[in-house]
Regions:
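Conserved beta/loop motifs at nucleotide-recognition and modification sites
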Residues: 1-148
């Protein structure tokens, strides 16, 4: 997976897909086992100033630092400091937001759209899930019948 952006937003109700993409992006951005340049924040109590301070810190023997923020509520409540920061953040910092609810009219959403990539992960219907399960089984070299 090629990483071309500094900021990613995974948003929507489909928690399994969000976790899969979060794990893939994390692996692509940092070498295996690099805990020195990885930070994880979760919940509405996340301090924007602390996140920005960490993003300003140079990575330790690596090209980038990854900061993952999950269900912070930053996209529902105004976060002007963070939206301004994203527009001028250093190349050594990467943000990965994982949110269930976002306000697409907000400044932070617009800043991420301008500087990064937004992936919406809506709940999948039965037919889509069935195709996905079949493809996963086939990748394992197994077979399953429709009636199973």
């Amino acid at each position: 997976m090629k990483i071309s952006k500094q900021v990613y937003l995974l948003d929507g109700e489909e928690s399994y897909l969000k976790k899969q993409y979060k794990d893939r992006l994390s692996k692509a951005m940092l070498p295996e086992g690099d805990t020195m340049n990885y930070a994880y924040y979760e919940g509405k109590g996340t301090d924007v100033k602390q996140v920005i301070d960490l993003a300003e810190t140079l990575p330790f023997f690596a090209p980038r630092r990854l900061i993952v923020m999950e269900d912070t509520g930053f996209f529902k409540s105004a976060s002007p400091e963070l939206s301004e920061y994203i527009r001028s953040m250093p190349e050594t910092a990467c943000f990965l937001f994982v949110e269930s609810e976002v306000d697409k009219r907000g400044k932070l959403y617009k800043a991420v759209k301008e500087k990064g990539r937004i992936v919406e992960m809506t709940r999948q219907d039965g037919a889509t899930l069935q195709k996905w399960v079949l493809s996963m089984i086939q990748k394992e070299g197994k077979q399953i019948t429709q009636s199973a």
